[in-house]
C-alpha cells in the first residue's frame, strides 16, 4: 500500500505542478491589480512547447540534452518519499534526509552544468549564479533540518515528521528557529523574487534556460515547476504535519487530501505576497541577506545545545 501511495502522490504532484506556477502568476497579477493569465496558462505553454522541435546550440553536448529529463526524474524520485497525506514517508528507502539533500544537489548540479555546456555567455553567467545560490542556501536547509533530526533522534524524514506531529514542548525554541531557517531556504529554493538571480528576465533573459527550445524547454519548465512544488511540499509536510494520516483509512485519506491542498494554497499565497512586496536583490547583496537564514539555523543549533 505504501508503494502505491508513493507512486500515486508522485504522479499527482507531477500533474498539478504547472498549476502551482499558474496560481502564483494569477496571485501576482491580482496583487498588481491586473487580470493576468488564467491558472491553466502554464499547461497551455508547456503543451505548445512539447509539440515543437527541440533545437540546441552547435556547441552543446549530452549534458544540455539530458538535463530536462534529469530534473523531472530526480524531482519525481523525491516526490515518492515526501510525507504528503501520511506522517510517515510512503517510500522509506528514500526517506533519509541526507539522501533527499543529495538528490536536490544532483538536480542543481545538472541545471548549472547545462548552462555551461552551451557556449553562451548568458547561460554561463546564469549557471554561475545558480551554483553560487546553491552554495548559500543548501547549508541553511541542511542545518535547519539537521536540528529537527537531532530532536527526533534520527535523520529519517518519517521520524522527524512524527516528532513534529507530537511537538515536544521542551524543544519548541530550537524547532521554531529551525522552521524559520527552512522557510527562508524554501523560499530561495523556489527561485522567487528577490532571489531569482539565475533566471533574471530583465538582465539574463532566463539565464540557463535561454538556449532551450521546443520539447526540451517544455520538459525543463515542467521540471522546474515540479521542483518548486516538491520543495514547498517537503517544508509543509515536515514542519506542519497535522492533518496527515498516522494510519490508513478512507476518511483519513480524504481529510489528508483536503488539508494538503489547503496547506499548499496558503503557502502559495504567502509566497506570492512576499514575492510582490520586494524587488530583486543585487547579485552582490545576496550573500549578505542569506546570512539571516543561516543565523536562524545557527541559533536553532545553539539553542538545541543549550537545551
Q: How does the language model describe each region?
A:
Residues 6-17, 92-105, 167-189, 255-256:
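Alpha-helical transmembrane segments
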Residues 29, 33-50, 194-217:
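Juxtamembrane inter-helical linkers in multi-pass membrane proteins
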Residues 57, 76-92, 111-120, 154-155, ...:
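Transmembrane alpha-helix boundary signature
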Residues 80, 99-114, 135-151:
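Mid-bilayer segments of alpha-helical transmembrane spans in multi-pass integral membrane proteins
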Residues 93, 147-175:
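Juxtamembrane/interfacial segments at transmembrane-helix boundaries in multi-pass membrane proteins
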Residues 113-116, 241-244, 264-280:
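Transmembrane alpha-helical segments of integral membrane proteins
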Residues 270-297:
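Interfacial loop-to-transmembrane junctions
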Residues 299-307:
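Juxtamembrane boundary at the C-terminal end of a transmembrane helix
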